[in-house]
Amino acid sequence: MNATAGAELFERGRSVALRINRVRSIAPWGWKTWLRSGNGDGMKTEDLIRCMAADTRQSQSSIALLLKGLVPSLGFTMAMVWVGLGIRADIAHAMMTPVFVIRIVLAAGVGLVAARIALLLSRPGRQGVARLGPLAGIAVVALALMVWACVTTPEAARCMATVGKSFPFCLVMIPVLSFLPVAAILFALRRGATTMPVLTAFVAGLSGAGMATAVYALSCAEDSPLFYVTWYGLAILGVAALTAAAGSRLLRW
């Protein structure tokens, strides 16, 4: 390897090293020594990334930071719903009805599953689209529920059941309530070293919006799956798209 190529490889490795040093995720084989030596011939960039991916300490620190930020942000979101919107008056009765419980389970499921996938994507060397299977499964369940509701709802009532009385409010409040959870997740993911920042940020947006939607559902009185699969789904996807646009910069090395 000539001197120019060696210097270029060293600089690439050093930039990655500084990124990981900043988040206290130094790999166990001690590459500070490699940096001090100034010898870029000893390791290729691909080897460096594989070693980073094998280090479990980065994942552990990301999970801890995620919980530290997510728990208070969700608590604040819950307080906003409780004080600002109010919990629906018939909540005790609603909790006994499957259509109400299912929407909370679906939204919370999106949030929790997406959080797990986002943490995996925040580590280099992880497959991207292949890890989205669980989210696709939740989407299939939601669409099946929507088809069931369409079949069982009288034709004359389908339009009203879909539009409801509060879909504009829903489309505004879910993004507003999602802001803090999404910010907490993105902050935790910055400890990682994702090679797919847009996809990782999109999944992070799904996670934060899903959790916020589960909280918002405690206030929303629209119980038809035609309503909440449509409008909750659009609001969650909208937040995810905005997060992907922002995360392409926030999560890039």
Where are these regions (language model features)?
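Alpha-helical membrane-inserting segments
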Residues: 80-84, 114-118, 122, 184-188, ...
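Selected alpha-helical membrane-embedding segments in polytopic membrane proteins
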Residues: 65-162
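Hydrophobic alpha-helical transmembrane segments in multi-pass integral membrane proteins
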Residues: 145-153, 211-222
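N-terminal juxtamembrane cytosolic/stromal segments of multi-pass membrane proteins
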Residues: 34-67
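Membrane-proximal helix-loop-helix units in multi-pass membrane proteins
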Residues: 144-199
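Hydrophobic cores of alpha-helical transmembrane segments in multi-pass inner/ER membrane proteins
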Residues: 106-116, 175-184, 236-247
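Hydrophobic alpha-helical membrane segments
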Residues: 177-178, 200-216
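Non-cytosolic membrane-interface motifs at loop->transmembrane helix junctions
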Residues: 94-100, 158-171, 200, 225-234
